[in-house]
Swiss-Prot record:
An MF annotation (GO) of this entry: DNA ligase (NAD+) activity
Transit peptide recorded as keyword: no
Reaction(s) this enzyme catalyzes, per UniProt: NAD(+) + (deoxyribonucleotide)n-3'-hydroxyl + 5'-phospho-(deoxyribonucleotide)m = (deoxyribonucleotide)n+m + AMP + beta-nicotinamide D-nucleotide
BP GO annotations: DNA repair; DNA replication
Full protein name: DNA ligase
Gene for this chain: ligA
């Protein structure tokens, strides 16, 4: 038995190496026939021993059909990227980076290096996260999902022959990449497909979202990896170093990666990538520009959605011509009435487009858009269809688009404010009220569990809910009269509404629906002004002092709290028992408060993210590099060069046990 297992291990190692040479390097060292003979030998041994190694190539395609997708919590967050659509926006991003670095270097002895960027292609596929354990075995693969929780697609990813099932690595890592379908694979699949695929992106996404693993394998997907999102081993000092690590692990990587020291070089690389876009065997929709130095990334930090040290440059979208059939006017949460174009259905980038953005009447007149005319439609950022103009020859039999004078839902007279039309009937205009209630109850706002748009519509139509405050007046007996509301569901909603009364101030500010104010801005306002009363009475001059609040956002906030009706609604909410609170985090005295700490090596009781959170909760600053300003270096198993640097500089070194004793 032992001899057979050893032979199996030997065959698995050989076959995986041959697959890497064939699929990744495109340089096979043995013939297909020799490979097949070894593969067949492995299959026979697996049947005889009834043992299959988790990284065996026979695991790439299974006969099973999965029942459902399970959730997977990523060890490291998968961030989205901010986007630039032109060089002006890219230069603005670059200048913001320069400003932060100059400020940091003026106050710190440990200077940051001059900005250096790495430019890569932006692949148009599906983002995936692959987890390899301390033995180098692929144990989990997942979709991006929310960035924190994705769906387990391990079986599907194993069908991608370029993705190694085992790597030569001795610590847990998560590697981010893009699963794609090549044009060659797309054409081959469609030759025999009963339902041909429309585009490469759908081909890749559909394959990974398929519970029939054999069907996934038929799509013959590929992948490129470009980021280590979680790493329990030695930390990287630069993105270049990270990319070399990914390559050395045998993970497939695009050959194009360029280093730039200024925006002129970045622009040239973007132009080059766009020039070869049509020649590639896969789709790209832009370029990605990232800061190379890892410490600089840490100083630049993150917004609530994006890393500030990376940005995606989006290429011009595709355009096509179709007929404008009609215009539909819709009412938003703020009462703004906006036009949507109804189009003769047309295929654009593999998607059937039936509707498009028109923005407002000024936009319609400027573009000379008319009913019945042929219009140019663009999928901006390859996602949102927008009308860019008209075909002049088609205007002869077209009709003018008339601006509405009444609300399409409640028939109230509309008022014009600048380029927009508004319905001021906030009490009985269904779309306004329903969207306001849904926003107020959402998870990031008042977090009223079990609330939905369908529920909001019923509350408006059947219970005559005409304001946010009316939510807190609802009785259980009233809910029981609604469709699908039984005793338990009614009681649960009443409880959820009552529980929401005790909410943090930032969530309450966000729930109010102030124009241009998202959750991050709400948090920043609370951090600056501390109380609801202070926020209500602040000036525009004070508001622009808040990080990332410019004059437009400041005026939105100021005007919002100048509205007597809004102030009256807020007072009613407070009188009904809503108690928004703000608590400054208090940190007890401890040996690590206000200390700079560097962590190196693997800890027994903490992941890298957990120890960072723990240290920050103690009031410590966590740094990625050791300097004479470092107070402690916390050392785990297999420490890297930071340990040697600490000894060299005479920095205090502690192990995990000493750390635990100090915080008891």
């Amino acid at each position: 038995m032992d001899n057979k297992l050893e032979k199996m291990k030997e065959l698995v190692e050989e076959l995986n190496q041959y697959a890497y040479e064939y699929y990744v390097l495109d340089n096979p060292s043995i013939s297909d026939k020799e490979y097949d003979l070894k593969y067949d030998e492995l299959v026979i041994l697996e049947k005889k021993t009834e043992v299959t190694l988790p990284y065996s190539p026979t695991q790439r395609v299974g006969d099973k059909i999965l029942g459902e997708f399970s959730k997977y919590t990523h060890k490291g967050r998968l961030w989205s990227l901010d986007k630039a659509q032109n060089m002006e926006q890219l230069i603005e991003w670059h200048n913001r980076n320069l400003k932060v670095i100059e400020q940091y270097n003026s106050m710190s002895e440990d200077k940051l290096p001059e900005l250096r960027y790495i430019v890569t292609k932006k692949f148009d596929g599906l983002t995936v996260n692959c987890t390899y354990d301390e033995n180098g075995i692929l144990i989990k693969s997942a979709t991006r999902g929310t960035g924190i929780i994705g769906e387990d697609i391990t079986a599907q990813i194993k069908t991608i022959k370029t993705v190694p099932l085992k790597i030569k690595n001795s610590h847990v890592i998560e590697v981010h990449g893009e699963a794609i379908m090549t044009k060659t694979a797309f054409e081959e699949y469609n030759k025999a497909a009963q339902v041909p695929l429309k585009n490469l992106r759908n081909g890749a996404a559909g394959a990974l979202r398929n519970l029939d693993i054999k069907e996934t394998a038929r799509r013959n997907l590929s992948a490129f990896f470009y980021d280590v999102g979680y790493n329990e081993g030695p930390e990287f000092k630069s993105y270049r170093e990270m990319m070399n690590f990914i390559k050395n692990m045998g993970l497939p990587q695009d050959k194009y990666i360029k280093e730039c020291t200024n925006m002129e070089e970045v622009e040239k690389e973007i132009e080059y990538i766009e020039s070869i876009r049509g020649e590639l065997d896969y789709d790209i929709d832009g370029a990605v520009i990232v800061v190379d130095d890892i410490k600089t990334r840490e100083i630049l930090g993150y917004t609530i959605k994006f890393p500030k040290w990376a940005i995606a440059y989006k290429f011009e979208a595709k355009e096509i011509t179709t007929k404008l059939l009609d215009v539909e006017w819709n009412v938003g949460r703020s009462g703004r009435v906006t036009p949507t174009a109804l189009l003769e259905p047309v295929e654009l980038g593999g998607v059937t487009v039936k509707r498009a953005t028109l923005n407002n009447m000024d936009d319609i007149k400027r573009k000379n858009v008319k009913l019945g005319a042929k219009v140019l439609v663009r999928r901006s950022n390859d996602v949102i269809p927008e009308i860019m103009g008209v075909v002049e020859e088609s205007l002869e039999e077209s009709e003018e688009i008339q601006a509405p004078d009444r609300c399409p839902y409640c028939n109230s007279h509309l008022v014009q404010n600048g380029v927009h039309y508004y319905c001021e009937n906030t009490l009985s205009c269904k779309p306004q009220m329903v969207k306001s209630i849904v926003h107020f109850a959402s998870r990031e706002a008042m977090n009223i569990a079990g609330f939905s748009e369908k529920t909001a519509e019923q509350l408006f139509e059947k219970l005559d809910i005409k304001s946010i405050a009316d939510l807190y007046k609802i009785k259980k007996e009233e809910l029981l009269t609604l469709e699908k509301f039984k005793d338990k569901k009614s009681q649960n909603l009443i409880d959820a509404i009552q529980n929401s009364k005790n909410c943090d101030l930032a969530s309450f500010i966000y729930a109010l629906g102030i124009p241009n104010v998202g959750k991050k801005t709400a948090n920043d306002l609370v951090m600056k002004f501390k109380t609801l009363e202070s926020i209500k009475n602040t000036t525009i001059e004070q508001l622009v002092e808040v990080p990332d609040v410019g004059e437009i956002v400041a005026k939105s906030i100021y005007d919002f709290f100048e509205d007597e009706k809004i102030i009256s609604n807020i007072e009613e909410l407070l009188n009904l028992g809503v108690k928004p609170y703000y608590e400054e985090e208090r940190i007890d005295e401890n040996p690590f408060m206000d200390k700079t700490i560097v962590v190196t090596g693997s800890l027994n009781n903490y992941s890298r993210g957990e120890i960072k959170d723990k240290l920050q909760s103690l009031g410590a600053k966590v740094s990625s590099s050791v300097s004479k300003n470092t107070d402690y270096v916390l050392v785990g198993e297999k420490p890297g060069s930071k340990y040697e640097k600490a000894i060299e500089l005479g920095v205090k070194v502690i192990n995990e046990e000493e750390f635990s004793n100090k915080i008891k």
